């Protein structure tokens, strides 16, 4: 193959990959239109990895929070839902400020729910906290998407997928009545 053909070949491969990703992305948005779908959203960008040891739920100043980029990203998540004609139903969130802020900025409404707080090192406590979350997903059979705004550990425990901040997994109810991941999306 000549050197002059390489840039053209690279461009063709890139365009094919982009078209495939766009098609997959539209399939996930389409899955959101199905009655009983569930969105499991990891909070928008918040610098760092964990809350400080002295963090308190009643004081956002003691927690890891969204920065300007994270707040803008949360707004873009909500805008992407609106652009795709998706009106969400109930929005439940971890009581951590970065999750509550993501939910408010994206969807304008939020109900704090302690079961979504995640990042607990005690495996048994994590399992017990996830039981009502799994039940809420199982009970969501119809209507607009249920949104769960949470942390990476909860997304992973619930879906088996690792997602970056600002990404979400769409769970769609199958013919057997169980929810399964239809895919994940990330809004820059």
Describe these PLM feature segments.
Residues 25-114, 119-122, 161-179, 184-188:
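Active-site-proximal alpha-helix that buttresses catalytic centers in soluble enzyme cores
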Residues 36-38, 142-150:
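Generic beta-sheet signal
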Residues 18-24:
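Sec/Tat signal peptide C-region and signal peptidase I cleavage site
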Residues 116-126, 130-138:
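All-alpha RGS (Regulator of G-protein Signaling) helical domain and cognate RGS-like helical scaffolds
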Residues 139-144, 174-175:
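A short, structured loop/turn motif at beta-sheet edges
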Residues 8-17:
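Bacterial N-terminal signal peptides
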Residues 1-9:
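Bacterial N-terminal signal peptides that target proteins for export
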